[in-house]
Amino acid sequence: MAATTFYAHTMPGVEDIAWLEIRERLPYARFVDKLFAKEKNGIVLFQYDGPIRPLLSLRATEDLFLVALSFDKITRGWKDLYQLTHLIAQKPDFRQAVDQLMQFQRENKQSGPPTYRIVRRVYGRYEYSPKDLERAIEKGIKARYPHWQLVEDNHARVEIWVNILGSRLICGLRLTDHTMSRRFKMARQIKTTIRPSVAAAMIHLTEPDENDVFLDPMCGSGTLLMERRMAGACRQLLGGALTPTHAHYANLNVLQMRKERPSSFTMFNLDGKTLPFADESINKVATNLPSGKYDMLARLYPAFFAEVARVLQPNGRAVILCSEYDLLKEVLRQQPRLTTLTGYSITTKKQWGRIYIIHRD
């Protein structure tokens, strides 16, 4: 089977972590490129010659697409649209991608009338407008698939996404729906809840193992705990929240997951400045540090990271998402047992932050 080119949408900045997961789960996948759609998405292009279904198990991605057409250098003029219409109507690559999508839908018992929807995202300055781009795509589809019906809702059988990023054009057919990015049903969410794909990326960076004693001491709605459960077995799963209300709802969210309830899961009402765990009793920590006034964070960070250094086992690992980079670096300089290995700048809910991997020496 010839390798097919796919692309994954991620939250901006998560694309490097998403590729690490793709490479681990799909050993024969080959990296093609990574792109950045302003502050909307990261994009990872890769080739893979296996069945499509295993792609749906990826966790650090928001959406997955079959690549139908790709141009490295467009003219930014009207010629682009004439060429796009022609290639949609005539090029075998587009037909092959549609056939693969239809086969995948049949295998998954998806059926329905041949409807389609166009999603266009344009970043840069061009002679044509986004609406002109949409009309060019529609013209090509009508020429090739005259029986297809254009619809405006989210229930089209075929979603054609066209991204123009500077001089790069990528046309993809969507394989997934909203359930990939909004995968958890929660009893209650709080405003600071991170997206599941970001939580999954953080969990991947912890290098999950069945012997883990895993802690999220500031678990919010419990998203990191839920993603750790999805990553496989662990010896103990521990969560903490500052208020009894948050602890209660995070506990409900984790326990209502469809997978068998873990006998080793415990939720604590705790303060991140004084963790109720023995020295060197935990080997993995992942958490999203709160944002807020600098004075409050300047009191929290030193005490919290002193506790992380205390409870982590030697060679343990902490994966921390925070927005106060300078404060974190200053505090870690005061903890000689903690070493920052690397970091990834990401954005979530229109706010930039950084995921740090911290090693306990």
PLM feature spans:
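Non-catalytic nucleic-acid substrate-recognition regions in nucleic-acid-modifying enzymes
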Residues: 2-153
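SAM-dependent Rossmann-like transferase core, predominantly class I methyltransferases
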Residues: 170-207
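Hydrophobic residues embedded in beta-strands of well-ordered beta-sheets
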Residues: 44, 168-169
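Core SAM-dependent methyltransferase catalytic element
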Residues: 44-48, 347-361
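Conserved S-adenosyl-L-methionine
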Residues: 194-275, 279, 284, 292
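Class I S-adenosylmethionine-dependent transferase superfamily signal
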Residues: 22, 228, 307-308
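S-adenosylmethionine
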Residues: 246, 256-257, 267-350
